[in-house]
Design a protein with these regions (language model features):
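Conserved radical SAM core fold
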Residues: 46, 64-65, 91-99
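Alpha-helix-loop-beta-strand connector modules within alpha/beta enzyme cores
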Residues: 18-40, 73-85, 145-156
Length: 234
């Protein structure tokens, strides 16, 4: 088992920017029982190679995957293997025409980006879709997910992207992810930290534990010090 599996990770995403990465993905699949998601940016052909390498899901970024025909090629490939797609919207890489229309990255623009690609999927009678609407701005991320959840019932992958180093990123992720999960929104989560990925898994479990949705590890109840304290705690 990998270090991430030992930490409790249940699904892992790897980027596939080139053929070497696709070949590495094949080796990764042979060494883990976890589902492996292939993260695709710009070059849609890498999605086709990732499927051949054994990816369990393909993530595309609507802001940089390119024209409709590219998405259709990916759809044809995943349909042949009965694989899902994650439409992974990112506030930092929205389509230029949406930025022009809305002025700047808004929740409405993010949802519209997802809707465009949902429409392409539906044209091809493909409905095995997961959606994410990530932003590094926590209130924007929360607003985007809420807006989408009001309109659709697709599974949602939650995350505050580019959340930052351990302390800052943990707090931003706890607020963003925790708020939505407490409202019944979200199906999978990723804590994004500029740190060891194992720490991302640990923080993710702490968020779930705080909402009584996970029991992994001990929950420490500790005195913060108050007027009842009779000894020098520190």
């Amino acid at each position: 088992r990998s270090i991430l599996e030992e930490a409790g990770c249940q699904i892992v995403r790897v980027t596939v920017p080139n053929r070497d990465a696709a070949r590495a993905l094949e080796k990764i699949k042979q060494s883990t029982k976890m589902p492996v998601v292939a993260d695709i940016h710009f070059n849609h052909v890498m999605a086709l190679h990732a499927v051949d390498a054994g990816a369990d899901k393909i993530r595309i970024n609507p802001g940089n995957i390119g024209k409709k025909e590219r998405v259709e090629e990916i759809l044809e490939k995943v349909q042949s293997r009965n694989l899902p797609i994650r439409i992974g919207v990112n506030a930092g890489s929205l389509e230029k025409d949406l930025l022009k229309k809305h002025g700047y990255p808004t929740a409405e623009a993010m949802v519209e980006s997802a809707e465009r690609h949902i429409a392409i999927c539906r044209e091809h009678h493909f409905d095995d879709i997961v959606v994410s609407l990530k932003a590094s701005d926590t209130p924007l991320m929360i607003q985007a997910y809420r807006l989408f959840a009001e309109k659709y019932d697709y599974p949602l992958h939650l995350g505050v992207t580019e959340a930052g180093p351990y302390k800052q990123g943990s707090i931003k992720s706890a607020i963003g992810i925790g708020t939505l999960i407490s409202e019944g929104i979200g199906d999978t989560i990723r804590v994004s930290l500029t740190d060891d990925p194992v720490q991302e898994v640990k923080v993710g479990f702490e968020i779930l534990k705080s909402l009584n949705l996970a029991t992994r590890g001990a929950t420490i109840v500790a005195c913060p010090t108050c007027g009842r304290l009779e000894d020098d705690l520190f």
